[in-house]
């Protein structure tokens, strides 16, 4: 016997289904579920009087070796680069085992053989929750260890960058220089509930000092103008990167001391490179570093202080810049240096270039002009600002939803940074076989405050009420680390990314590492065309007199925002 119920009642019980629409937080971004992998009438739900019980949705006979899951997230709405769908998510051995229909094949239709719910299965209700892949932030100044929990609680599960603590070199540059510091930072990484990876110093015009850092465990090299970003340095770093299959990230030469943008591009010579804050407010050839985004070998990123362009952006940046780069307001040359980097015209253009899919990656620049806990929020604020100012994307016209725009923006802090740094086989999307790094959101809090962060298949952090309360929800509700973040579980739920060469050198044994170490691969055979939904390479020009930006000959400009969604109303407490 079947039962017909209206959509509102169905959604309240099992979450939205195909054709239903969801507003993301208080933005104007509306997504529509494209496909429902669950089976009507055979839905899974845990709780008193619900279906996940012995002999019903839970198999009475299947063992773990016969395909029983460790964890099932039921009826979840997934937002990922590949689609916006509703499905059960199955997790086993810390990895995503299935996306589809879970349950008991003896009593239910459509259950996938690798998604059996049994006595070995934990359950979490994904009804009326959105699930995204854990965020990846590739521009981290490791200044303070407290950044890591702040990032985790915002929905970031992988942090890549460099540093040694609050030394002036780290305050300004994302670099962990030399074997001794690389070893110490890899040892420190053992303590943190986060996937981590460290850049060595790429600022050297000969190869041997760079080789030894990759051999020691750096996952890539970072070139920064504060150490000198000359063509010789760029060439040497890229030669070493090609030799070891690692990525090079670059903060180019704001002062044009060793050459102009064209000289840097000639030194790069068609080799793949990840450009940081490619608009230029965070640093880079003034005034036209933004042109780098048109090259097919450049993987262009933004940092979040310029995201999105608002009425407060310019004033805030000048003060931040003086502090972060050890400048003095009493030295005229320092003030001129700061002024040259902060250009309203290029910051406004950056908004539009993100919306067009020309800029490909979002990151933070943590404590060094960027906010480590705001990568996700700033990404969706930019999407909303562009939705309001530019309307439908061409790909969304006629669909009465913003699905393509949502896929484009979520890719900027998930799959694309993973591809850029050779870790997309492990993280960056909700796909079978990848590490189960998942973030669960209530739609009204999407992009601001996650409900639960799952890391390597285990809940690692969550919003949690008073531990002395009779139920989990009484205030004060704070983000707290959960069991996945403690003891030896941490070393199995989190990974450290290193070079292939360092694994061959057996650094785990030499340094005494217990955390999973995973090699980066495929960093040198990629280009911008591999960056999903963000692969456009139009011609970009910048007028050196008034900083006007044109794309394929058309001037691009937008007004600064005076109000933003996902802002103060979410962070009063």
Swiss-Prot record:
InterPro entries in the record: Amidohydro-rel, Metal-dep_hydrolase_composite, Metal_Hydrolase, Urease_alpha_N_dom, Urease_alpha_subunit, Urease_AS, Urease_asu, Urease_asu_c
GO biological process, alphabetically ordered: urea catabolic process
UniProt modified residues of type N6-carboxylysine: 222
Binding-site list for Ni(2+) 1: 139, 141, 222, 365
Keywords: Cytoplasm, Hydrolase, Metal-binding, Nickel
Pfam annotation, one family: Urease_alpha
GO molecular function: nickel cation binding; urease activity
Cofactor remark from the record: Binds 2 nickel ions per subunit.
Protein's cellular compartments: Cytoplasm
Record's catalysed reaction(s): urea + 2 H2O + H(+) = hydrogencarbonate + 2 NH4(+)
EC number, as in UniProt: 3.5.1.5
Residues involved in substrate binding: 224
UniProt binding sites for Ni(2+) 2: 222, 251, 277
A single Gene Ontology CC term: cytoplasm
Post-translational modification remark: Carboxylation allows a single lysine to coordinate two nickel ions.
Broad class of the protein's primary localization: cytoplasm
Assembly information from the UniProt record: Heterotrimer of UreA (gamma), UreB (beta) and UreC (alpha) subunits. Three heterotrimers associate to form the active enzyme.
Family (UniProt): Belongs to the metallo-dependent hydrolases superfamily. Urease alpha subunit family.
Protein name as catalogued: Urease subunit alpha
